């Protein structure tokens, strides 16, 4: 048995030093805005585009990473807009998907739409939320750590992944975009 001091002297003499992980200080900024969960209020959906849910799912295919963001109408479970990216953490998949949804919304400018999402950093970001009121879209968010609040979207994500891998038998990365044509 060797004492701690003796071990320290031996390591110092031999030039052995531990490498510690350096903590990077993050300056506190504005906290993300959390919106109430409007789906829990018994929202009555009587027609299309009244309540749209969104979520992002990630998957690997032949060594490549993909992120797929979907926007789905709760009235008829129709995929209204989607965006696919091969870059991890790409915020533009959310924005491109939202732009597709806004194009549909422009056809019915007076209709108030509820967009229900999780509390992800992009969905709660300032730039994402500044776009919504411009097009008469009300934001609703799931409770933290509760994916069952957005169960319809989570189920569609699981179903799409199962379809991609089990039914389409994808063999190369080029076919992923062809496969997503069937999502529309």
Summary of predicted features, one role per range:
Residues 108-123, 147:
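Acidic/histidine-rich, metal-coordinating catalytic segments
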Residues 129-133, 145-148, 152-184:
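Charged alpha-helix within mobile-element recombinases
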Residues 83-108:
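Active-site beta-loop-alpha junctions of metal-dependent nucleic acid enzymes
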Residues 137-145:
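His/Asp/Glu-enriched short active-site or ligand-binding loop at hydrolase and phosphoryl-transfer sites
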Residues 7, 11, 39, 55, ...:
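Mobile genetic element proteins and their domesticated derivatives, centered on retroelements
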Residues 1-47, 146:
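Basic, flexible linker segments flanking DNA-binding modules
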Residues 63-64, 124-126:
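Catalytic cores and conserved motifs of cyclic dinucleotide signaling enzymes
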Residues 45-80, 84-88:
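An active-site-proximal beta-strand-loop segment
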